[in-house]
Amino acid sequence: GKHMGGGNEDYTTAKNALQEVRNQTDKFGLLEDFSEVFSYDNKNNKEIIFAIRNARDEYNMWGDVTYNNNMFPQQNILFGYMDENGNPISSLGDKVKVNGTIRYPVNKDVYTKCFNDNDTRKRSTLQAAYEKKEDGTLSLYGLYPAKFLGTLLDGADTRSPLDDYPVYRYADCLLLLAQAKAFLGEDPVEE
């Protein structure tokens, strides 16, 4: 690239390597449903090129509690709020059996300004918790992750963070290929 004397030769090398991956359509591709890319029940799907694997009874990169503690609210607090349709969050079932201390709350602007309502990634990335006002209207209170929810193991009352962690996705390959083509003055529209 632009560092250490690189240039078109580096971009060409990158483009060729990325095209090799893109051309393996039997092995890699984009999923129709973005939420399925990160689903515990859909590990090693067609969009995943390389991931750090996590499984039950093995050491995992989530440290069993780190991600949950930092990103999720306590279940008893979360259950006091509503979803966007005014239904109690507790009615969402196993999907919200999480516990944490939400040390890193997501800024509400990420949800309201970075995504529009037609963006399918919005509700597949973040879930909103609403407060029901006295007049019956809903007010956005906070957010919690919709990705990397883990799984509910037999006999457990909270989810275990056993999701694989994608390092390279097919979507990354397409974006990098488009960037390499753009640096070479080629048309990246196909990607």
Per-region residue spans from a language model:
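Hydrophobic alpha-helical scaffolding
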Residues: M4-G7, Y40
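Specific register positions within alpha-helical solenoid repeats of the TPR/Sel1-like families, i.e.
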Residues: G1-G5, L175, A182
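Elongated scaffold/linker segments in the mid-to-C-terminal portions of large proteins
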Residues: A17-E20, D26-L174, K181-F183
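Enriched for extracellular/lumenal, surface-exposed ectodomains of secreted and cell-surface proteins
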Residues: G1, Q24-T25
